[in-house]
């Protein structure tokens, strides 16, 4: 494959094991330390990259307060081998934050404003709760449906509009746990999980190299027994078909194709296009549809050209309408989230965009695909998507 000098390539990807936010493995680990551990280990693994060459550390994080405040990108960077002469910024696009971090780095590389970037994101939802310090504008209900800030209710709305049944959602949730468990047993996550010290349920320090969020004993019967989580009267969305509240971080090394060639590095993939899009906040989960369509058009591709898709599983009631309207629902078992998704692994907000993108690249590497799309919905009505080509 012929690459242009300013093409944007992904050199490597790593993530923490995903930990439960309530009493999980990361309960005594700070968000900056999780982030710094990933950055340091990924740079050690890629010793041809001089940390002094890093132009900027771009880190996604949604709730930027407490230990995640005051520019956590810089806080984490200062704990690593990256010198003080490199810069750092924290970005938020809610659920799409670390994919936005990737896009920001890519745009800088494309415009010759740097060659080497470290991107990723973190969310410690056990230490910094989802609503900590949040004060929504009461006048917002004049401009968008009042329930638009309640993600579970927007999923209920989207599922109802598209005729998604409770049974379909339960089957999708079961699939996520089964595939994530299978991927774990077969070592499919080995290249992406960077082991970390944490604490087990008995309080003993140990090294974790697996996700503690996966429930291999999940059954359709156990899912069917769960009560609706957001709409008790007639709702279909449950805790078992929603993304888990978890703690985690993800990281990528991104650079220009020219710099990768100069360093003798074989990249994982090249970015072919990027896009963001807005939708009605009341159906925020639909955002991946226009974002993906826009990204495909920019890449000169159609959905039929795409070998693998990683779609963030915010809710089964949201994911299924997206797959239906992207016309891949009938190809789901061959193309979509082959290692499970956020229903099994969790959705630490700032982490997820880079996490699903990196998982996609590993799926492509392991299965020989050429083109892949990572995409996700975003609270209050947005979508974001990236098209990759395996190098």
UniProtKB/Swiss-Prot annotation:
Q: Does the keyword Lipid metabolism apply?
A: yes
Catalytic positions? 95, 347, 377
User: What keywords tag this UniProt record?
Assistant: Acyltransferase, Cytoplasm, Fatty acid metabolism, Lipid degradation, Lipid metabolism, Transferase
Q: Does the keyword Cytoplasm apply?
A: yes
Catalytic reactions on record: an acyl-CoA + acetyl-CoA = a 3-oxoacyl-CoA + CoA
Q: Name one GO biological process term.
A: phenylacetate catabolic process
Looking up SUPFAM superfamilies in the UniProt record yields:
Thiolase-like
InterPro entries on file:
FadA, Thiolase, Thiolase-like, Thiolase-like_sf_Thiolase, Thiolase_acyl_enz_int_AS, Thiolase_AS, Thiolase_C, Thiolase_CS
Q: In the Enzyme Commission scheme, what number(s) does this protein have? A: 2.3.1.16
Q: Which Gene3D superfamilies does this chain map to?
A: 3.40.47.10
Question: What are the recorded GO MF terms, alphabetically?
Answer: acetyl-CoA C-acyltransferase activity
Any Pfam family matching the protein: Thiolase_N
The terms describing its cellular component in GO are: cytoplasm
Its subcellular locations are:
Cytoplasm
Instruction: Identify the pathway.
Output: Lipid metabolism; fatty acid beta-oxidation
| EC top class, as a word | transferase
- Major location category of this protein: cytoplasm
What PANTHER family does the annotation carry?
A: 3-KETOACYL-COA THIOLASE FADA, 3-KETOACYL-COA THIOLASE, PEROXISOMAL
Matching HAMAP family: FadA
What function is annotated for this protein?
A: Catalyzes the final step of fatty acid oxidation in which acetyl-CoA is released and the CoA ester of a fatty acid two carbons shorter is formed.
- Assembly notes: Heterotetramer of two alpha chains (FadB) and two beta chains (FadA).
Q: Which family does it belong to?
A: Belongs to the thiolase-like superfamily. Thiolase family.
What's the name of the protein?
A: 3-ketoacyl-CoA thiolase
Q: Which organism's genome codes for this protein?
A: Pseudomonas savastanoi pv. phaseolicola (strain 1448A / Race 6)
Lineage from the top down?
Bacteria, Pseudomonadati, Pseudomonadota, Gammaproteobacteria, Pseudomonadales
- UniProt lists the gene as fadA
